Amino acid sequence: MSRKQLALFEPTLVVQALKEAVKKLNPQAQWRNPVMFIVWIGSLLTTCISIAMASGAMPGNALFSAAISGWLWVTVLFANFAEALAEGRSKAQANSLKGVKKTAFARKLREPKYGAAADKVPADQLRKGDIVLVEAGDIIPCDGEVIEGGASVDESAITGESAPVIRESGGDFASVTGGTRILSDWLVIECSVNPGETFLDRMIAMVEGAQRRKTPNEIALTILLIALTIVFLLATATLWPFSAWGGNAVSVTVLVALLVCLIPTTIGGLLSAIGVAGMSRMLGANVIATSGRAVEAAGDVDVLLLDKTGTITLGNRQASEFIPAQGVDEKTLADAAQLASLADETPEGRSIVILAKQRFNLRERDVQSLHATFVPFTAQSRMSGINIDNRMIRKGSVDAIRRHIEANGGHFPTDVDQKVDQVARQGATPLVVVEGSRVLGVIALKDIVKGGIKERFAQLRQMGIKTVMITGDNRLTAAAIAAEAGVDDFLAEATPEAKLALIRQYQAEGRLVAMTGDGTNDAPALAQADVAVAMNSGTQAAKEAGNMVDLDSNPTKLIEVVHIGKQMLMTRGSLTTFSIANDVAKYFAIIPAAFAATYPQLNALNIMRLHSPDSAILSAVIFNALIIVFLIPLALKGVSYKPLTASAMLRRNLWIYGLGGLLVPFIGIKVIDLLLTVCGLV
């Protein structure tokens, strides 16, 4: 991705976030975060008390009360700032996307064909089903499907990649995105969405997160935080009569300070920022998530369905050998294989034509001049070929050719079965060539497993994630490649129906499944999967079925998506642990300061030897506010992620964030107390 990455504290974003933090001080905005709403009420209450003390309407230390009140307002502002900064980063990314949208006109065709009469209309008036013509230099005005033509398209405004891509009618490369530019030739496009519903519009809406809903885990954590807040609120409320009965009633200002320091304000103030930042980090990986729920689900995934081609292997299978059947010479097999591949534009098909040319000097022949009919490959038939004169030549998977022969009254030879097994055991893909009902032999297609992929799968296994390779190869080939790559399981001879059934099977076992896809035939499985990453180069149906879109169209990105999801969950859990552990030090700071006058025995808890009750309480409140600011970078960037088992991860986080949450406040509160004392502020 070539887009400029935002600095963590971009000056313009910080200024805007500070303004938004002040705007969020209104009760309606605060009510959405129950923990910080309690702090907001406490700030308001102590402000009123400070004013009353200053005017003489109430007895007490007005300066101390004002200091507490001021730092409580700062606490609320810092929490608002964290959320506003995260939202500001997302909106800045959205603004870069808005720059792609241009007010333009489109040539709307009156008939769905090239050369038809056209009307010039504003692009924002195009409706679903309208037909438009775009030529070299034009901006594509809407999302749609190419129904005629082929062109080179610059998609860098959307994907960040400068290399142009080919878009043409038919197949999985017919989908185009509004806002991209035609570099050469022309396309006739059928609009697939109405105004405001384009992929670019949805990207902007998703990134801005204006309607961001809380995820299930976020809701569960919020409920826990509310429960803790209620417990501490009730406990604090009982302390006033408790101290009054002892003969020295503690002030309301001190009780509010105690309450604010005990409730989990750290995670309460950063919770929204963590959620927004998770989606922002996903965008940083060039993946657009439809919601925070999708990002969170990625963190809970325990089954990955990975396409073999392009994900596990390099994806450039090449014909490496012609293996003739008994009684057939190799040149006859090569000639038939080349004829069956003349109109096959896949890399495999072109490699078969080239291999026949190299081995036997068989030159390419024009399908039209031969008066031949090309039979295209389909996911259901699993074979392709050519009909020429009285010859019917097909090439395809072993099972598909076997069914084809038996349907034509033929018999699949035993020696070819042996040759197929031999090719498959070597990790190559066997394609069988047949003419009529006579098997001519086998073509070996060789692919290479990506370097380092086995180690990545070992890491995923250590994390408790099962990897399943999806391939159209036969079981022997699939087993050989699966063993070489180190995946846990595989689905061979996969059809769209088989993928859908496999996903449902895992989900019935209580597992969360993630997969990638780019074709229309992937849409049912993408719609069923818990995390479905559609390729931006794929069809409109695939992108609509998925809950994420990878702008780089890189199937391997699924592993990174899972890492980002887990990092978001870890960040939330780690900061929750840190926030709750913080309370221990605050007990030792505020409890002796507030109640030692009534119960001198509580002085034993003043292990930090803080200067005075006022400095102890003020130091705890100041630390409580400042820690939010210090943790903002961690909330936005996420905690350091390492692929470990769940138990090892728990131990690591308890040591770092649990123990850290215990020790840091002791040090921080003591340092603040010393500074207040040295400066003569208490």
Curated annotation (Swiss-Prot):
Catalytic residues, chain numbering: 307 (4-aspartylphosphate intermediate)
Primary localization: membrane
Pfam families to which the protein is assigned, alphabetical: E1-E2_ATPase, Hydrolase
GO CC annotation: plasma membrane
Superkingdom to which the source organism belongs: Bacteria
Keyword DNA-binding: no
Residue numbers binding ATP: 344, 348, 377-384, 395
Record CDD domains: P-type_ATPase_K
Protein family according to the UniProt entry: Belongs to the cation transport ATPase (P-type) (TC 3.A.3) family. Type IA subfamily.
Free-text function comment from the UniProt entry: Part of the high-affinity ATP-driven potassium transport (or Kdp) system, which catalyzes the hydrolysis of ATP coupled with the electrogenic transport of potassium into the cytoplasm. This subunit is responsible for energy coupling to the transport system and for the release of the potassium ions to the cytoplasm.
Identification of the protein by name: Potassium-transporting ATPase ATP-binding subunit
Organism: Escherichia coli (strain 55989 / EAEC)
Gene name linked to the record: kdpB
